[in-house]
From Swiss-Prot:
Residues 56-76, 127-156 are extracellular. It is a multi-pass membrane protein. This is CASP-like protein 2A1. Residues 1-34, 98-105, 178-205 are cytoplasmic. It comes from the Eukaryota. The chain crosses the membrane at residues 35-55, 77-97, 106-126, 157-177. Residues 1-25 are annotated as: Disordered. Belongs to the Casparian strip membrane proteins (CASP) family. Pfam families: CASP_dom. GO terms for cellular component: plasma membrane.
Length: 205
């Protein structure tokens, strides 16, 4: 019998098939790495846009001057977007490096993605609350409707908050990706049948 046929029958795959499979795996991992890198760079652009827009948000008229720094919610939004922009750039560089992913690295990305998702979500939420008070006012806490006198300021703040919510969506997607990459490393649990000595996988990937 031909040796190539024997190897095919015994091993199930020829050497050519193994080489082709490994190349396909490399191409797939490379495309996944590129996609994740782009996904991590996209929120950085939005973070910088929201940050710069809010930093330049100031209006002066006959009623006085109103700046983003006068409101703690907007200061937090600036800081949160700055932190997320830096993390997005750093994580994109790390992901783009062609190195094998370890369990500790997967856990680190999972943890940081989750934390920063909630950080930027909180920034967007408190900014919306501040904008609501600025537009509607609150007599109980003697908060006047500032948007009546500072309409331009409020419009820029709304735009920055909307962009921040887009960042939240991006980070939610990143959290899903890092969760999948982490928990897909764990094998399926085995189900044992007592007395029969048979173990089967509960599910297959």
């Amino acid at each position: 019998m031909d040796k190539s046929k024997v190897s095919t029958a015994v091993g199930g795959e020829t050497p050519v098939g193994l080489i082709t499979g490994s190349r396909d795996d490399e191409l797939e991992s490379g495309s996944m790495r590129t996609a994740e890198t782009v996904l991590r760079l996209v929120p950085m652009a939005f973070c910088i846009s929201a940050l710069v827009l809010m930093l330049k948000n100031s209006q002066t008229n006959d009623f006085g001057t109103l700046s983003y720094s006068d409101l703690g919610a907007f200061r937090y939004l600036v800081h949160a977007n700055g932190i997320c922009a830096g993390y997005s750039l750093l994580s994109a560089i790390i992901v783009a490096m062609p190195r094998p992913s370890t369990m500790s690295r997967a856990w680190t990305f999972f943890f940081l993605d989750q934390v920063l998702t909630y950080v930027i979500l909180a920034a967007a939420a408190v900014s919306v609350e501040a904008l609501y008070l600025a537009r509607k006012g609150d007599i109980a806490i003697t908060w006047s409707a500032a948007c009546v006198s500072f309409g331009g300021f409020c419009h820029k703040a709304i735009t920055s908050a909307v962009i921040t919510f887009i960042v939240v969506v991006c980070y939610a997607l990143l959290s899903l990706v890092s969760s999948y990459k982490l928990f897909s490393r764990y094998g399926a649990p085995d189900v044992s049948y007592p007395g029969k000595g048979i173990e089967v996988a509960a599910f297959h990937s």
